[in-house]
Structure formats: C-alpha cells, structure tokens
C-alpha cells in the first residue's frame, strides 16, 4: 500500500482538528488515512460516548464533514471518503 499523499495527510489533520472541536474527549480523536488507489479513505475514531456528537442529529454533522471533504477533494484533485469507527 502506498504512503498517503501530502494532500491526504493535510486533510486528515484538518479533519482531526474539526472533530476535536465537536467532542468532549478530544484527546481520543484520531484520523487514519488509507490509500485506496483511486482515492483516500479517512477513518475517524473517537470515544464511544462522542460518536453521537460526530454523527449529529439525523446524521447532519457527519454529512457536513463529508461535504467539506468533497469540496477539498475538488481543490486537491483527489477523492476522499469518510467513516466513523467505533
């Protein structure tokens, strides 16, 4: 598996910073970048008690995060997918 691009690493850091602002236990937030060949998969982990905050009411927060990643992907010329792991 190839190493993530510098774009993907920067996106992961930005995503981690945003998610840390949303949760009660920011020290438990991590974002791992997985190179899928045709794009990057960003796996967010957070404390189980914070999962609802990351997902948001009716999934609005995680959908907003995905929308931000889509916009960033257009700028970077990459593809980013997001999933919350528990």
Name each region found by the language model.
Residues 1-51, 64-86:
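RNA-contacting regions in translation and RNA-metabolism proteins
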Residues 55-59:
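Glycine-centered tight-turn and secondary-structure capping sites
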């Amino acid at each position: 598996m190839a190493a993530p691009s510098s774009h993907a690493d920067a996106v992961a850091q930005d995503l981690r910073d945003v998610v840390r602002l949303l949760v009660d236990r920011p020290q438990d937030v991590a974002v791992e970048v997985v190179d899928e060949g045709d794009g990057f998969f960003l796996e967010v982990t957070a404390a189980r008690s914070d999962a609802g905050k990351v997902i948001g009411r009716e999934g609005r927060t995680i959908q907003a995060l995905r929308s931000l990643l889509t916009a960033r992907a257009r700028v970077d010329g990459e593809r980013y997918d997001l999933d919350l792991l528990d």
